[in-house]
Regions:
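Outer-membrane beta-barrel "beta-signal"
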Residues: 253-267
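Solvent-exposed loop/turn segments connecting transmembrane beta-strands
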Residues: 32-34, 57-67, 164-166, 179, ...
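Repeated loop/turn-to-beta-strand initiation elements of outer-membrane beta-barrel proteins
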Residues: 48-52, 77-84, 125-130, 137-138, ...
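Transmembrane beta-strands of outer-membrane beta-barrel pores
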Residues: 2-4, 56-60, 74, 88-94, ...
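Membrane-embedded beta-strand positions of outer-membrane beta-barrel proteins
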Residues: 1, 52-54, 70, 84-88, ...
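C-terminal structural cap/anchor segments
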Residues: 125-220
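Outer-membrane beta-barrel translocator domains and adjoining extracellular loop/strand segments
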Residues: 2-15, 65-69, 95-103, 141-146, ...
């Protein structure tokens, strides 16, 4: 894992590298060449109901990515509001995509495009939303997993859509907080319609379509333990395709459950 400092190029490929568009093993680990990266971010809130974010990442010789987020909320009663958001993501290969040799190239497609949106409702201790993400078939969305999680509205812990093209993702999220008890509970249910595991040009890691259920319970300590938070996370992933596939595309990928017990300290 990423437990030490890496050069930018060597940080890409620490985790699983998946396959090339022709199904052969990707070989970009320790073969990705870049002089570094630069990031520019702009946030603007013209009024209390509207907020904008724009981010641009330039990774020399690999890719350029632009991310735009627009969010709107509308108060509809005492401590209640409707919320809506739109995200647009455009990624383009630059230079060699990391390496001049195809099997060692990190970004093999010329571009990828993603659209994500949400519509929801919030009160002082309740929240619920419907979320949708579309990764077009323009190319595989490739963002180094070592650098963090996906930013899209359909993101669920222990879920990634990186390495995929032609995806339809639907997620319902609901949560309730209990301020006096310092407890919060969050539920998320998602359906992720993915290309065939044998469509290597659109499915880098051989992940089949799946349904996912997350239950997240948290307790925040106070007093001498102020800043400490405990978390119990349950995840279930179920295969959501009738396609006949090899066990290697099922084991540790779908038809599985996971429990995490975590202690976080927030400074």
């Amino acid at each position: 894992g990423t437990v030490k400092w890496y050069d930018v190029g060597k940080s890409i490929g620490v985790y699983s590298t998946g396959v090339n568009a022709d199904g052969s093993k990707s070989e970009y680990e320790n073969n990705t060449h870049t002089k570094g990266l630069a990031m520019l971010g702009i946030t603007h809130k013209p009024n209390k109901s509207l907020a904008f974010q724009f981010w641009n990442i330039y990774t020399e010789n690999i890719f350029r990515a632009s991310f735009l987020q627009i969010e709107l909320d509308k108060e509809v009663g005492k401590k209640q509001k409707w919320i809506a958001g739109v995200q647009l993501f455009q990624q383009n290969r630059i230079g060699e995509g990391g390496n001049e040799e195809l099997e060692k190239k990190y970004m093999q497609d010329k571009a990828s495009f993603i659209f994500s949106t949400k519509l929801g409702w919030e009160s002082h201790n309740w929240k619920a939303s419907f979320n949708f993400t579309r990764i077009t078939n323009q190319g595989r969305y490739t963002m180094p997993r070592e650098w963090g999680r996906d930013p899209f509205y359909t993101f669920m812990p222990r879920e990634r859509n990186e390495g995929l093209a032609n995806v339809y993702a639907y997620v319902i999220k609901a949560g309730k907080s209990f301020p006096k008890q310092r407890v919060s509970a969050n539920l998320a249910i998602g359906h992720f319609n993915l290309p065939s595991v044998y469509d290597f040009s659109a499915n880098k890691y051989g992940l089949p379509s799946y349904n996912q259920l997350n239950l997240d319970l948290r307790y925040t300590f106070n007093g001498i333990l102020s800043g400490l938070e405990s978390q119990v996370l349950f995840v279930y992933k179920g295969k959501a395709t009738n396609e006949s596939i090899d066990d290697r595309y099922i084991i540790n990928k779908v038809n599985m459950s996971l429990w995490n017990i975590v202690l976080n300290y927030n400074f």
